[in-house]
Each structure stands twice: as C-alpha cells, then as structure tokens.
Amino acid sequence: MARSSKLLVAMQGKGVFVIDLVERSVVSGLHDCIVVAPSPDNGETFFAGTDKGQYKSTDGGRNWQLKGLEQYKIFSLAFHPSDPKTIYAGTEPALLFRSRDGGETWTELDGVRKLPGRSKWCYPAPPYIAHIKGIAIHPEDPEVMYCSIEEGGVIQSLDAGESWRYVS
C-alpha cells in the first residue's frame, strides 16, 4: 500500500475534504459524497461514492470525474487486498458492483440480486430502500467477502462475490 500524507474526510452533504498533513492545506470538493476511499497503490488517487454515482480523483482530490454507476447511490467501497485495480461498490438499492480496471468500468455481481428473501430487505426510513452499507474482504483469502445490508443482515461470499449466503 502506498503511503500518503493526506487525510480524507467525507461529510454527506458537505463534500470531500483532503487534508495534506505535510503542506498543512485543505482541498474541498465533490459535494453529496457518502463514502470515500484512497487507492492502495497511489497516494494521489481517491474514489468517492455519491448519491449520483462513482467518482475518481487522480490529483489528490482537486478534481473529480464521474466513473459510472450514476443511477445508484454508492454507500460502500472496498479494494481487493492484493489487486489495487479491483474495487467493489455497494449501492442503494442493495446491489454489488466490481471494477477490475481501477474504477473505469463496472459490472454487477448478480449473486446479491439472487438471494432469497431479498424482497424483505428494507431501510427503516423513507424511501425504505435497503443498501449495502459495508464491504469486507478477507486480507489473506480475497475469495471470502462479507457485506452488511441495511436492513437485511450480513451476507457472505466464498467465491469473490459471485454467490452469497446469509450469515445473520
């Protein structure tokens, strides 16, 4: 993982703030951000999920480019532990997408869509749509993944997100 002197702070409705701890400067931008994640192989590349899709910055957060999934709210992001070009995005409605090219293109992993009982997932506040709130990938066995569904429980994949089962 690349080391960086930058601290990312995402505040929903306020934007992404990139604080440079060496230069003691702050860069702000990209409002409506829900989640932000630094690239593990480059201290200047950041990814952000918003209520209007997936964004990427390659210049330390100064500029952002929309990189797809614009019809979804992005609630969670996770990087493959040994392949920094592979990124997972959890959305509202509760779907899971994967990019194998550093966030340039995205493919839905439809195993989440096929889970029985999915129609009962419901977020308790309007608009009552469940979303994938968290994604965790086992650091030594990236075939093993977990997603938390708000509200719907925790699901597990043993094949890098292709199929899923409930664990709670």
Question: What residue spans do the PLM features occupy?
Answer:
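Extracellular glycan-interacting surfaces
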Residues: 1-168
